[in-house]
Design a protein with these regions (language model features):
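Membrane helical hairpin/interfacial module
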Residues: 1-37
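Long, contiguous internal "core" modules enriched in hydrophobic/ aromatic residues
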Residues: 47, 51-236
């Protein structure tokens, strides 16, 4: 999105991690149902049980949020792989050449195609960013929309967004280091990439700490008995 020259080295790892983690997150609404093997009971289809899903449930929001996020993220990952798939189609032989050529959607690496690709890619990234923010906000509302003391708070949405970016950067650093060691990509994944990710991780750490401090100081200053009981229980 910002056309950073460092994006090409870390972008693919970040995009792949996004898709994998979203697919993993998609399992949790099914797990939270309780009897996961009967998940189809909540689907809106006519049956003799006369049971219908509660569309006001926050878990319903998760279904739509996670589904849209995984679809757009997978398309974003696939779009970034088009030049790589076209390159593979030229390097392999036999049925693999036709397979990769079909996956690359006929990307021929011409100047006009590259110009179109470099124009469309940042636009797609600009679409993914607000979608990611909205998805993590929806997940936070699973907790914030309840009347549970300590959870019913307006700060949960930005708190979850900051935590998602914070943990995502940390996971990306670990994954990139493993890829660098296993596949001997020291010349490609250089110390400057890890240094910049470390700076970004520090910034998000401070932001996450700020949200945590704000949450605790607000509860402490309010002094409501039910909130203070939960507050002190976290320190004992």
């Amino acid at each position: 999105f910002t056309r950073s020259p460092l994006r090409s080295a870390i972008g693919r790892s970040a995009e792949a991690m996004t898709v994998i983690t979203i697919l993993t997150a998609g399992l949790y609404p099914i797990i939270h149902i309780g009897r996961s093997w009967l998940f189809f009971f909540v689907l809106p289809y006519p049956s003799q049980r006369q049971l219908w899903p509660n569309f006001r449930s926050p878990l319903t929001w998760d279904v739509f949020a996670i589904s849209s996020y995984v679809l757009v993220s997978a398309l974003f990952l696939f779009m970034g792989m088009l030049p790589d798939l076209a390159l593979l189609a030229r390097q392999v032989k036999g049925w693999r050449r036709g397979f990769y050529r079909a996956l690359s959607l006929g990307f021929g690496s011409t100047s006009s195609e590259w110009k179109l690709f470099e124009t469309a890619y940042p636009i797609f990234a600009a679409i993914v960013i607000p979608l990611a923010i909205s998805v993590h906000s929806v997940v936070s509302w699973d907790f914030a929309m309840t009347l549970m003391p300590g959870w019913h708070s307006a700060i949960f949405a930005p708190y979850f967004v900051a935590g998602a970016i914070f943990s995502g950067i940390a996971g990306l650093i670990v994954a990139m280091n493993l890829i660098r060691k296993v596949y001997h990509l020291e010349d490609y994944l250089r110390p400057v990439h890890f240094n910049n990710l470390g700076i970004l991780l520090l910034v998000m750490t401070l932001l996450w700490f700020y949200f945590t401090f704000t949450e605790y100081i607000t509860v402490y200053y309010g002094g409501e008995p039910i909130h203070m009981t939960i507050f002190w229980s976290k320190f004992t």
